[in-house]
Amino acid sequence: MPSEHGTALVTGGGRGIGAGIARELAADGWSVVVAARSPDEIDSVAEEIDGRAIELDVSDREAVERAVAVVGDIELLVANAGVAGPDGATWEIDPADWWHVQEINVLGVHLCCRTVIPGMLERSSGRIVITASGAAYLPGSSSTAYPTSKAAVARYGETLANELRGRIPVFFFSPGLVKTAMTGHWGDDLPWTPPELAPRLVLVLASGRADALAGRYIHAEHDDIEDLIVRADEIVANDLNAIRLQR
């Protein structure tokens, strides 16, 4: 597969936001590997974009390590795989179901990142983009599992960006309220985010033009990424778009 930019690994790439990101990257000249647990879906997306498909459970350390070894040099990791988890009263949810959300949404991000980072450091090249969520900052009232996982992911992304600053840019972003198979049952009257915004944002983050914003929280709908790039020095100097307590 000819590639202008290198290889991008997109987890959770068989549907929804991940599939949109895979399509956007492929259209821009990336060689895209689509990874997820659903073989039919990833095969379909991979065929559509002339990419590759790898069946992958991101919470399985050995499976992640095998997948990264098979793919080879990864220039861009989009750690997007996630599940919404069980709704209902926290005290009534099976702890195994609650913990499963953390395994996919948090451990899965960590395993993918820790596995690709050594190669990126060795090549002095690469970027990481993590799909977070506004649920990290705006807790709902129907489940503790999902917002807990996304709060952890946001802090993980910010901290990892600090660890790798000056070496590997790490971004985390909220795609907004996108209507997907995971969220579509919530109803039609919600303020749904246009599905094309997240893929467009990831494309900019992958380009290198936004590297000064590594470790800053970015919202695909509420933030204008081009404006943020222009204001990057101000944002860093004043510690804006950061996770913090308000007092």
Please report, for each region that a protein language model flagged, where it lies by residue.
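Conserved glycine-rich cofactor-binding loop
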Residues: G14-G16
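The beta1-alpha1 cofactor-binding region of Rossmann-like NAD(H)/NADP(H)-dependent oxidoreductases
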Residues: E55-R66, P95
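Conserved mid-core segment of classical short-chain dehydrogenase/reductases
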Residues: A84-W99, S142-A145
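Catalytic Tyr-X3-Lys loop
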Residues: W91-H110, S125, V129, V153
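Active-site helix of classical SDR
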Residues: C113, S149
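Alpha-helical segment proximal to the catalytic Tyr-Lys
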Residues: P118, N162-E163
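Residue(s) in the substrate-gating loop at a strand-loop-helix junction
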Residues: S133
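C-terminal helical subdomain
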Residues: F172-F173, D188-R247
